Design a protein with these regions (language model features):
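Long, contiguous binding/interaction regions
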Residues: 1-13, 17-134
Length: 134
């Protein structure tokens, strides 16, 4: 579950990712539509959606293994956002699978702290969820 600002001031988009059958998805949609402040419920199809999450992970690091950690982060197109004498903080964005793979690579070094957001998503191509502006 993620709530995020949109291109329209005062309107936030809530992204809810569920693993459910069609009947349960319909029920969730109906319940969301009953909420007064909800303007619109849009169901995104996995094949036509770009979805990403962000993760910050603090990894134990010293002068001997820091280059390996940085190289591994670079392979995943992640960024080192903080370096301390005994740790490195890495910022990564991507699919849950990509983030899990990065964690798997960092695990042997020692994960000291981790926080991961839920996913945000948009349709691929020109289709938008926002009303068309003239």
């Amino acid at each position: 579950l993620v709530s995020a600002k949109t291109e329209t001031v005062g309107i936030n988009r809530i992204t809810v990712v569920v693993d459910a059958d069609e009947l349960n998805i319909e029920q969730i949609t109906k319940q969301l539509n009953k909420l007064i402040p909800v303007l619109k419920v849009v169901r995104l199809d996995e094949e036509t959606t770009i979805a990403r999450a962000i993760m910050l992970v603090k990894v134990s690091a010293d002068s001997s293994n820091r280059p390996q950690i940085v190289d591994a982060a670079n392979i995943f197109r992640a960024r080192v956002v903080d370096v301390a004498p005994d740790s490195v903080v890495i910022e990564a964005t991507g699919t849950p699978g990509k983030l899990r793979a990065l964690l798997d690579v960092m695990e042997p070094f020692g994960i000291r702290e981790l926080i991961e957001s839920g996913q945000i998503a948009l349709n691929r191509g020109p289709k938008t969820m926002a009303p068309v502006k003239n």
